[in-house]
Amino acid sequence: RKNISAHYDLGNDFYEAWLDPTMSYSSALEPGEDGLEAAQRRKWDALAARIGAAPKVLEIGCGWGGLAGFLAARGADVTAISLSDEQLAWAAAHHGAGVDFRKQDYRDCEGQFDAIVSVEMVEALGREYWPTFMDCIARNLKPGGRAAIQYIAMRDDLFDAYAKSADFIQAYIFPGGLLIRTSEFRRLAEERGLAWQDQRDFGGDYAATLE
């Protein structure tokens, strides 16, 4: 919780100065001539397509609430959680209609949802908490439900060396965080009876987002 607060509670003015108008702090989808905001909304469309017309949705790590607000506008009953006071205040002010924004740890989530979404949150947890994160998905997802998880992956052949050292991002941007490798994430899902389907890799879009 201290790591989350140290990073995300720097003040919303700081993030508004350099994020796009949707306040999306994650990779967009297919950034191009129509601009970053359009690419972020394209990502939301893609995530919404993956979960279908789910009536009850949980978002783990909701950031400034853009995706939650988007899903609510499409008719979903959305519960969105974060540990950042600054993010939650901004989210409630801009996307409060139809969304239940909560300051809550994902480990404390108890409910049954038709769909779960999480965008670039698992990287902040640290390796020891990856199983707990997947426990949360399995516990709170209704039978037949869908989860759409966007995450930044580390290649298997680079992971061991990466995990043994602290790079610039771990030291100065996301203390306590670690990028997950897809093989490990998939194993954790399948061990809990979750089917791993429809994987889409778009790492190149992250580079374009940062540009």
Show which residues each predicted segment covers.
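N-terminal auxiliary segments of SAM/dcSAM-dependent transferases
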Residues: 1-17
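Conserved class I S-adenosyl-L-methionine
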Residues: 54-61
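Conserved SAM-binding loop of SAM-dependent methyltransferases across substrates and taxa
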Residues: 64-75
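Conserved SAM-binding strand-loop segment of SAM-dependent methyltransferases
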Residues: 96-107
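A short acidic, Gly/Pro-enriched loop at the edge of an enzyme's catalytic core
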Residues: 107-116
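A short glycine-rich, Lys/Arg-flanked "PGG" loop and its adjoining helix->strand segment in the class I
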Residues: 131-143
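Conserved beta-strand signature within the Rossmann-like core of class I S-adenosyl-L-methionine
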Residues: 144-152
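Substrate-binding/catalytic lobe of Class I Rossmann-like enzymes that use SAM or dcSAM, i.e.
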Residues: 153-211
